[in-house]
Swiss-Prot record:
It comes from Haemophilus influenzae (strain 86-028NP). The gene is pckA. This is Phosphoenolpyruvate carboxykinase (ATP). Mn(2+) binds at residues 211, 230, 267. Its cofactor is Mn(2+). Involved in the gluconeogenesis. Catalyzes the conversion of oxaloacetate (OAA) to phosphoenolpyruvate (PEP) through direct phosphoryl transfer between the nucleoside triphosphate and OAA. It catalyses: oxaloacetate + ATP = phosphoenolpyruvate + ADP + CO2.
């Protein structure tokens, strides 16, 4: 048994006093009763659905609040954190010690004199590189969320659990002095890397706790040469590991969920001297337009112990997954063992030999697959490109590009080149190859079929792409295969999908110019300047 007196003393050391009761690492059964008990109001209330999962609402915050994210500027962080600047805007805004202290007082005062849930877990399936995390909250479903998402310790591990990092979730409290303090709003998600504490105020969105710790892993791990990556990962029957980077909507979860391979994890991973390891103990999947037919694994994972966020629940308790009236970002968290085909008991495997960058190019320029050189790997990793089709007033759909460093700029705490260097170093040591896979559009105006994309992924994973005859795509100088088993050869060179190749040429020149313009911000140091040659020629 864990000594609750010790936990109470540790809470007092944080400034949380006169706690009525500590509900320590509650079981799923206990959490179910707590979050559905009569008398709960507002966003604390959980609703039982016919799936067996409980659904909760997070109010106006149906996604992360990047404008309210701050990191304390101190001796430790001033020269290490990738701070926002006029030339390279990001979400790492500095906060002074006095403002931090006032926010900490607000949160600890909110949590004092309450009945609290304290959940201890690990971030990272590597014993050497994990962070022991303690989450303190007064809301039952928030305790459920972190129990799903972090790695659940054994009874033995809990006996001697010493937190490396504490998340204090005060979602019921807001900051009345935000204007005088020069902050963005009354809500806040603040980090102190010296005290190793995250404070949350005003926002009820569960993902702040998950992504907050991802940002911290993104700080601590690369500084010791360990990769920290926004990617999914799986492993084949022969132990061959593949990792899939990609922004939202590019197919990261769908393509890494493969009946022929075991899932290591779907979102956040590290790469150390042993290999690839998951940071998480669960999955946080989008549920908008979810169907049993298209995503059976996720559909069947939504059962007792899963937690639905911001979905529309009908009067009979059934869930309408097609209703995005609260948000398009409807989600479900569930423990990873709700997926059958996973690596267990520990979500880790050997070194990756295939690294796949997924992009959904709405411009119709990039090939469905190309093999990258080490320099191109760094260039396209730092660029982190994808594009969406956005409707305009006249019904014309125009592509809007997104460049997100390392396919996860929102979560980077160090300069992007540090992640690129660790990745390429790890890849070279493992003899890994990198590929750029476009799951987007081509000259036909249609999206590349999931059948062709799966065929491409199979060709990468089974090595047949290595035997293919290669050609070169001009402007981007990308190596492209001329034929692959199970893939329509007519799509492999994007120029062939246009009735008039000059059309591809002008679109390619336009997109190349966007890449070049975006990359200027990385050319501030020698490493960045050296990579310009690996990019497209505008």
């Amino acid at each position: 048994m864990t000594d609750l007196n010790k936990v109470v003393k540790e809470l007092e050391a944080l400034g949380i006093y006169d706690v009525k009761e500590v509900v320590y690492n509650p079981s799923y059964e206990q959490l179910f009763e707590e979050e559905t008990k009569p008398g709960l109001e507002g966003f604390e209330k959980g609703t039982l659905t016919t799936t067996g999962a409980v659904a909760v609402d997070t109010g106006i915050f149906t996604g992360r609040s990047p404008k309210d994210k701050y990191i304390v500027l101190d001796e430790k962080t001033k020269d290490t954190v990738w701070w926002t600047s006029e030339t390279a805007k990001n979400d790492n805004k500095p906060m002074n010690q006095a403002t931090w202290q006032s926010l900490k007082d607000l949160v600890t005062n909110q949590l004092s004199r309450k009945r609290l849930f304290v959940v201890d877990g690990f971030c990272g399936a590597s014993e050497h590189d994990r962070i022991a995390v303690r989450i303190v909250t007064e809301v039952a479903w928030q305790a459920h969320f972190v129990k799903n998402m972090f790695i659940r310790p054994t009874e033995e591990q809990l006996k001697n659990f010493e937190p490396d990092f504490v998340v204090m979730n005060g979602s019921k409290v807001t900051n009345p002095n935000w204007k005088e303090q020069g902050l963005n709003s009354e809500n806040f998600v603040a980090f102190n890397l010296t005290e190793r504490i995250q404070l949350i105020g005003g926002t009820w969105y569960g993902g702040e706790m998950k992504k907050g710790m991802f940002s911290m892993m993104n700080y601590f791990l690369p500084l010791k040469g360990v990769g920290a990556m926004h990617c999914s990962a799986n492993v084949g029957k022969d132990g061959d590991v593949a990792i899939f980077f990609g922004l939202s909507g590019t197919g990261k979860t769908t393509l890494s969920t493969d009946p022929k391979r075991e899932l290591i994890g779907d979102d956040e991973h590290g790469w150390d001297d042993v290999g690839i390891f998951n940071f998480e103990g669960g999955c946080y999947a989008k549920t908008i337009h979810l169907s049993e037919e298209n995503e059976p694994d996720i559909y069947h994972a939504i059962r007792r112990d899963a937690l639905l966020e911001n979905v529309v629940v009908r009067s009979d308790g059934s869930v309408d997954f097609d209703d995005g009236s609260k948000t398009e970002n409807t989600r479900v968290s569930y423990p990873i063992y709700h997926i059958d085909n996973i690596v267990k008991p520990v979500s880790r495997a050997g070194h990756a030999t295939k690294v796949i960058f997924l992009t959904a190019d709405a411009f119709g320029v990039l090939p469905p697959v190309s093999k990258l050189t080490p320099e191109q790997t760094k260039y396209y990793f730092l660029s982190g490109f994808t594009a969406k089709l956005a409707g305009t007033e006249r019904g014309i759909t125009e592509p809007t590009p997104t460049f997100s460093a390392c396919f996860g700029a929102a979560f980077l705490t160090l300069h992007p080149t540090q992640y690129a260097e660790v990745l390429v170093k790890r890849m070279q040591a493992a003899g890994a190859e990198a590929y750029l896979v476009n799951t987007g559009w081509n000259g036909t105006g249609k999206r590349i079929s999931i059948k062709d994309t799966r065929g491409i992924i199979d060709a990468i994973l089974d090595g047949s792409i290595e035997k293919a005859e290669m050609g070169e795509l001009p402007i981007f100088n990308l190596a492209i295969p001329k034929a692959l088993p199970g893939v329509d050869s007519a799509i492999l060179d994007p120029r062939d999908t246009y009735a008039d190749k000059a059309q591809w040429q002008s679109k390619a020149e336009d997109l190349a110019g966007r890449f070049v313009k975006n990359f200027v911000k990385y050319a501030t140091n020698e490493e960045g300047k050296a990579l310009i040659a690996a990019g497209p020629k505008a």
